[in-house]
C-alpha cells in the first residue's frame, strides 16, 4: 500500500546465487530441542503467497543457486529472469522432507511428467529447463540448452503411475540408461518423502491456485519435519555430512498407503 513503491526487484547477494533455501539445520535443532517451528513456516509460506498476490511488479533475478526457499521468493514473482548460470532444484526428498513453498504448483503443471521427475529426484536443472518447468519466464541467451525435453519419452512413460512402486519399477526396467539412473537417485531418497511427494503432486491439478498448494504444504510440513527421516536426512547431508542416511523405510515398496494418507 506504500505509494512510494512502484515495483520490487529481488537480487541475490554474492556470486554463489540468489538463495539456497531455508536453514534446515536450525529447523532440525529446533525439533530436537522441542521448540516450536510452526511460526517459521507460517511466515515463510505467508511471504510466498504475498509475493504471488502482490499487485505491483515483482521482478526476480534468478542467478546461480536458486533452490528450495529461494524458489519460493522468486518463482511466484510477476517476472522471473534466469541467468545463464541459474541452478534450480527442490531437493527436499534428499533430506526427508517434501518440495514446498508452493513450487509444486508449477511442477505439477509442467509439460508431461517432467515436474514429477524433478520433484522426486531432487535433480538440479538449468535456466532453460527452469523456463520449461514454469519456474522462470526468460532464460539468458547464453544459457546452455535444457535436457528435460530430450528426456520426455522415458519420463512420460515412467512417471505417470499413481503408485511410487510402479514408478520405480518402470524406471528400473526401462531400456534408456537415463531412466535407470533416475531410479537410482530416487532409491537414495527418503522412501516416505518420495511417496508423500508423489501423492502431493498428483493432488495439485485439482487445486485452484498457489494458495491451495501452500495450504497443503503447511499441513505436510507439520507431518514431515517431526519425522525421523527429516532429522536423519539433515544429519546425513548437512550436519555429519556422511551422506549415508538410515531412512525409516528400507525401500519405497515398504511405505504403506495408510502412511501416505496420514500426511
Report residues per predicted region.
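Hydrophobic residues in alpha-helical segments
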Residues: 28-31, 119, 159, 186, ...
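Conserved catalytic cores of soluble enzyme domains
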Residues: 37-41, 45-62, 66-77, 81-152
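Positions in alpha-helical segments
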Residues: 105, 180-181, 219
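A structural preference for short, pocket-lining loop segments at secondary-structure junctions
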Residues: 1-32, 46, 50-62, 83-86
Amino acid at each position: 500500500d506504500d505509494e512510494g513503491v512502484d515495483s520490487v526487484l529481488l537480487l541475490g547477494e554474492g556470486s554463489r546465487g540468489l538463495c539456497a533455501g531455508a536453514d534446515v539445520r536450525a529447523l532440525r535443532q529446533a525439533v530436537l530441542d522441542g521448540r516450536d517451528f510452526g511460526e517459521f513456516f507460517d511466515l515463510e509460506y505467508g511471504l510466498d503467497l504475498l509475493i504471488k498476490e502482490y499487485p505491483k511488479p515483482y521482478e526476480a533475478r534468478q542467478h546461480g543457486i536458486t533452490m528450495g526457499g529461494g524458489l519460493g521468493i522468486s518463482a511466484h514473482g510477476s517476472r522471473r529472469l534466469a541467468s545463464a548460470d541459474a541452478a534450480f532444484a527442490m531437493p527436499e526428498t534428499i533430506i526427508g522432507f517434501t518440495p514446498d513453498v508452493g513450487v509444486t504448483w508449477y511442477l505439477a503443471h509442467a509439460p508431461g511428467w517432467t515436474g514429477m521427475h524433478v520433484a522426486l529426484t531432487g535433480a538440479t536443472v538449468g535456466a532453460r529447463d527452469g523456463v520449461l518447468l514454469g519456474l522462470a519466464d526468460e532464460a539468458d541467451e547464453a544459457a546452455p540448452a535444457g535436457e528435460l525435453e530430450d528426456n520426455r519419452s522415458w519420463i512420460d512413460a515412467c512417471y505417470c503411475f499413481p503408485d511410487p512402486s510402479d514408478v520405480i519399477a518402470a524406471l528400473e526396467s526401462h531400456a534408456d540408461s537415463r531412466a535407470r539412473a533416475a531410479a537410482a537417485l530416487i532409491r537414495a531418497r527418503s522412501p516416505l518423502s518420495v511417496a508423500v511427494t508423489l501423492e502431493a503432486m498428483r493432488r495439485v491439478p485439482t487445486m485452484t491456485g498457489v494458495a491451495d498448494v501452500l495450504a497443503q504444504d503447511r499441513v505436510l510440513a507439520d507431518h514431515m519435519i517431526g519425522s525421523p527421516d527429516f532429522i536423519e536426512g539433515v544429519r546425513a547431508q548437512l550436519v555429519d555430512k556422511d551422506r549415508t542416511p538410515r531412512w525409516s523405510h528400507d525401500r519405497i515398496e515398504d511405505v504403506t498407503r495408510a502412511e501416505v494418507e496420514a500426511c
